[in-house]
Regions:
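PP2C/PPM-type serine/threonine phosphatase catalytic domain
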Residues: 1-129
């Protein structure tokens, strides 16, 4: 069984936390993500919030079937989900504004992993400490 935790807090510059993080686990399957809304742009919290909600909804409806998918196919599913978030945001924000979010997504399943990133957020692998 996988165990972990998530902590996300508002920084010193902004009054609104534009970041979202989550860990969704079921046995030896886990989806972890960090979505970092783009500061200085319109509604970064909306972008990261949409990604977080979309991943949670996906988990609730699809993670059981995804356990059996080849990793390349699963990567395409996640890419389509994130592209859908971007399209939805582009429809909802004012035409002269821009908003977005970075994403680090880690899927762990039975000893295999899939890592997807977009933007300047990072994932580090630590060994022995």
């Amino acid at each position: 069984m996988l165990q972990g935790g998530v902590l996300c807090k508002t920084g010193l510059k902004r009054k609104v936390n534009q970041d979202r993080a989550g860990m969704l686990a079921d046995g030896d399957t886990c989806l972890c993500y960090i979505a970092d809304g783009m500061g200085g742009h319109y509604a970064g919290e909306k972008a990261s919030g949409l990604i977080a909600q979309s991943l949670t909804d996906w988990w609730d409806g699809c993670h059981e079937a995804a356990r059996r998918m080849p990793l390349q196919e699963l990567a395409e599913h996640f890419k389509e989900l994130l592209d859908g978030c971007a399209s939805q945001l582009n429809r909802e924000i004012p035409e002269d504004e821009y908003c977005g979010s970075t994403i680090v997504l880690l899927w762990l399943n039975g000893g295999q992993y899939l890592l997807l990133t977009a933007g300047d957020s990072r994932c580090y692998r630590l060994r022995r400490g």
